[in-house]
């Protein structure tokens, strides 16, 4: 991953990071790297995510995927990190012949519409819950299982499970002798894309999982004790420094349709990991060039509270723009859609810089397995580094757990929710 933080420095941006402040911050980056390295060496909770390129069993994942490789449709049943990683990998790299869906919400209209539309007899289902107790995942899977039963489909032959050692999902899998992959120990779901949580979906979708993991291993090998020597740390440190100076929003803007879901994955990673103790940078999601026509106005002329992260691949497929008899479009005809999209990228970067909006440019070689594996690993490492600089517990999510527990109690008719003031207008 190659990043350019020049347009985030104070010579261009407001807010911007002074070079001397970046130099001082690099001392903290060195200490943070030592802590991260120690956490990795001890395989500590959370830090173990950065060991996945070494510990993940690609052969076991590939073998599990091969059992349902004949599927025309794949449904991931999970939520949050148990679904976003798979969706990111399949959307970025998956075979176009596979009809892919992530059931990551319990909206009855959506669930029933999906199950009515797909051919369940040629579908594979991957159920993912690290704890095995996730209410939304269990509920959706029970609905899917019932639909397969009603359709006369042997759901046990079409289902793969990833979960922990205990919990209702593990018990169900054991009861019905379902194939089970162990969720990685000590790895929160949002950091588990490069594991049994998401890689099975990628493998079923025809992705070279070995190359994905190799790309992640490249990122692990590139970790170093200075932001000047490590692109992942440079990103995490710059985002942190800008937040400290008022850029409390981080807009992820990929210029590739296949990386649109990556922006969703990034949003969970950044928000759930860093949003604690009254600090954290709020992620926003956009897509270039589409959202130049919806959000760019705000980025350039709205509040000076944003970092814009612009992401693109260095190479793209060819798609020529034909000649036409229309006037005043000579700059288009005979060109290429990729060249047009890259021109939009460059023009947007220049327009943001001209307006003083802090911008970081991120470039990967291509949207291929090795590059995407490196991209995911590097942003995970950037997030861990930022968490060390913020001084937060990067790998927990207590605010989320409160809501989960309250929902369970509400459904069981136990403790009522605390009363809140209402002001209803109809």
From Swiss-Prot:
Pfam families: PGI
Disulfide bonds: none
Active site: 272 (proton donor), 293, 404
Catalytic activity: alpha-D-glucose 6-phosphate = beta-D-fructose 6-phosphate
Compartments it resides in: Cytoplasm
Documented EC number(s): 5.3.1.9
Pathway: Carbohydrate biosynthesis; gluconeogenesis; Carbohydrate degradation; glycolysis; D-glyceraldehyde 3-phosphate and glycerone phosphate from D-glucose: step 2/4
Protein known as: Probable glucose-6-phosphate isomerase
Gene behind this protein: pgi
């Amino acid at each position: 991953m190659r990043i350019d933080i020049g347009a985030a420095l104070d010579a261009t941006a407001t807010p911007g990071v002074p070079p001397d402040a970046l130099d001082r911050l690099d001392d903290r980056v060195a200490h943070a790297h030592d802590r991260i390295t120690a956490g990795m060496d001890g395989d500590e909770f959370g830090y173990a995510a950065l060991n996945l390129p070494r510990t993940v069993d690609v052969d076991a994942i590939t073998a599990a995927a091969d059992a349902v490789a004949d599927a025309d449709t794949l449904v991931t049943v999970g939520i949050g990190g148990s679904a976003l990683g798979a969706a990111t990998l399949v959307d970025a790299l998956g075979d176009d012949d596979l009809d892919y869906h992530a059931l990551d919400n319990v909206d009855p209209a959506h669930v029933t519409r999906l199950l009515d539309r797909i051919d369940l007899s040629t579908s594979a289902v991957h159920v993912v819950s690290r704890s095995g107790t996730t209410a939304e995942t269990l509920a959706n899977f029970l609905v899917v299982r019932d639909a397969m039963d009603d359709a006369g489909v042997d759901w046990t032959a079409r289902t793969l499970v990833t979960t922990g050692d205990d919990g209702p999902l593990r018990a169900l899998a054991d009861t019905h002798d379902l194939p089970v992959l162990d969720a990685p120990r000590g790895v929160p779901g949002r950091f588990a894309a490069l594991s049994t949580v998401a890689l099975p979906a990628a493998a079923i979708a025809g992705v070279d999982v070995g190359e994905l993991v190799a790309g992640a291993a490249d990122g692990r090998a590139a970790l170093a004790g200075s932001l000047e020597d490590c692109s992942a740390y440079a990103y995490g440190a710059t985002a942190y420094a800008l937040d400290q100076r008022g850029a409390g929003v981080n807009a992820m803007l990929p210029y590739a349709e296949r990386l649109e879901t990556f922006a969703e994955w990034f949003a969970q990673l950044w928000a759930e990991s860093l949003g604690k103790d009254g600090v954290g940078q709020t992620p926003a999601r956009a897509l270039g060039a589409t959202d130049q026509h919806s959000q760019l106005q705000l980025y350039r002329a709205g509040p000076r509270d944003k970092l814009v992260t612009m992401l693109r691949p260095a190479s793209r497929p060819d798609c020529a723009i034909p000649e036409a008899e229309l006037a005043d479009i000579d700059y288009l005809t005979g060109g290429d859609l990729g060249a047009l999209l890259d021109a939009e990228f460059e023009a947007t970067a220049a327009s943001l810089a001209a307006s003083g909006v802090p911008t970081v440019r991120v470039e990967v070689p291509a949207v291929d397995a090795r590059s995407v594996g490196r991209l995911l690993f590097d942003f995970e490492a950037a997030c861990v580094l930022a968490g060390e600089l913020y001084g937060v517990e990067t790998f927990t999510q207590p605010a989320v757990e409160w809501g989960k527990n309250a929902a369970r109690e509400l459904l069981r008719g136990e403790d009522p929710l605390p009363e809140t003031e209402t002001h209803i207008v109809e």
